[in-house]
Amino acid sequence: KSFLEAVDPNLASKLIAPAQEATNKEIEETSGQSVGLHMTGGFYLASNKTWYDYLKRERSKARYMGLHQEFISPKEVAERHPLIDPKHYLAALWDDQDGDLDPSGATYAFAKSARVHGAQYFTHTPVTATTQKSDGSWDVTTPKGNINAEIIVNCGGLWAREVGHMQGINIPVQPMEHHYLLTEDIPEIAAAKDRLPCGIDYEANIYFRQERKGLLLGTYEQRGTPWKVGGTPWDFGHELLQPNLDQIADRLEFAFERIPALAETGIRQAINGPFTFGPDGNPMIGPVPGMTNYWCAVGVMAGFCQGGGVGLTMAEWMMDGEPSIDVWAMDVARFGNWASPDW
């Protein structure tokens, strides 16, 4: 299940987060399909002064945008999440609008809502070519026939680079391996009446949330592992990759220290899969410079936190000529031709 994170270092990403929350409610109502949302609240943990100061800045940004976040003490952290050892922390920033959702349910809800509003989508229909016509529109070639479109948007995900290459465009994104673990049942969770909050520890580079009667623990290692630098195979079917726990061993040491129950609990499954980053970690959205009617929305690594806001921003940009917020930190135009694979 997807984890919703509301703390982000740039204002543009912060501004689109509320749009995602509104989108979740809208697509449930329109589609009749649950997105499996658990609004547990979540906290962002500061273990030293550097991260405490960082969270103070983030809270200031949140207040500026009307988002409600508040600091709580380590004691309050332990009261809300008794598996956490509070002695490692100075403070935590609490967000009562955080939580997680079911990515499969959310995807179906988006698809059903789109169809209600007149959109069409075609599964198992690969795009093999994109050809611009003299009037500026595009022919999108598929094995089932051509689709003519006024505007095309590269939302290729792991295949964003390959879709761009169809038109001679270099999209500077790179898939990276990402690990997370699912634990066996933890007695304290099994006995709890309410679902536990989710959390992020910035120094440890870990995030965690309840999964059934255990925990999901994810890591962001400081030395990430690129995947398929030469290009994503067209026949890749989102298969999982071989886990490499040595790669995240130092992150796990932090986790076992700060959530002691993890050291005493079995690992039910270790999961490793690729997802895509831009060079600075932010999405790359908007019209591609030098092209007509060619847009992109790629590198959205925090998909279910940012996806609805990215979609709204793109729609405003296309329909009104500009988005309602300043998206400089996400504009694809911030990277020029110099952002090549060699770079």
Kindly label every feature range from the protein language model.
Residues 33-44, 58, 78-117, 139, ...:
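Helix-loop-beta segment of a Rossmann-like dinucleotide-binding subdomain
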Residues 14-17, 45-54, 93-116, 122, ...:
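Short beta-strand to alpha-helix junction loop
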Residues 10, 129-241, 250-258, 337-343:
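Flavin-dependent oxidoreductases
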Residues 38-42, 176-177, 270:
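Short Gly/Ser/Thr- and Asp/Glu-enriched loop/turn motifs at secondary-structure junctions
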Residues 203, 212, 234-343:
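C-terminal catalytic lobe of FAD-dependent flavoproteins
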Residues 92-151, 159-162, 308:
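Helical element adjacent to the flavin cofactor pocket in flavoenzyme catalytic cores
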Residues 1-80, 203-207, 212-216:
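Dinucleotide-binding Rossmann-like beta1-alpha1 core, especially the glycine-rich loop
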Residues 39, 73, 123-125, 269:
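Short loop/edge segments at beta-strand edges and connector loops
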